[in-house]
Amino acid sequence: MQSSKYRHRLPQLGQKLFATDGGMETTLIFHDGIPLPHFAAFDLLRSEAGIAALRSYFERYVRIARDQGVGIVLESATWRASSDWGSKLGYDAQALADATRKSIGMLLEIRDEFETPATPIVISGAIGPRGDGYVAGARMSPTEARDYHRVQIETFASTDADMAAAFTLNYVEEAIGIVAAARSVAMPVAISFTLETDGRLPSGETLAEAILRTDQESDGYAAYYMINCAHPTHFRHVLQQGEPWLQRIRGIRANASRRSHAELNDSADLDAGDPQTLGAEYRELRDLLPKLSVAGGCCGTDHRHIDAMCRALKAA
């Protein structure tokens, strides 16, 4: 029987600020020069050098959290570790499960070494979309999404991970299915939608529609919602009405770049933006999101951006 530390009392649901990491894949590719076929960071777990690169990556953020006196949510390197993406890299179901457990195990070791009372460390199993994160292509029904993602979520539940979190979701049915799969194994789950430059999901749905429908279809089971892989200038306007559904948003993992998803997809370079400016934009977002407690980054962000976010939010 597993004994997770925070599964039944996620500390980021309180008032304390929690950091996350930045854009893992873009950092590894553009800063560290590590190729990641299909953006699959979990593939690094098959070599000692890859494991060392991932551990070094995570420890950099943990040290920032400790220096700043904030908590941190560590997301496993498993955004691509589901069956469709794994098969593209030659992984069968058992190999994917082994990689998933290894990814969580590494984060547990980091927690054992670095956690302090002032810096609680939450271990989260990262889930990615079945398809392209930027395009709402072939859409699953909620039942199909539940069945597809259940295998990965069951693997997370069998470890000492505290929760699961699904990132870069671009249509609501996939979110509903993921929440249902997590609920079936009593695993806390956060849902993070990605938004286009108009503040809508790639499917055309509004953020309000996505959150409210997911909650309606799952009896509000999701622990909280997030926004990721979009720049604050793309979605700030949808947060300015003060509606009750905004209380469900606790996390932001923004891009460093103001580029659209299409522009990012076609870009051969990394637009890292300005860390201090992004930090200031997070401080403005906190005024619009009363429950914001989880701050991290997505494409183009690195440790500099997370440090700036923490400093700005602590000063707010």
Locations of regions flagged by a protein language model:
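Domain-level signal for soluble alpha/beta catalytic cores
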Residues: 1-316
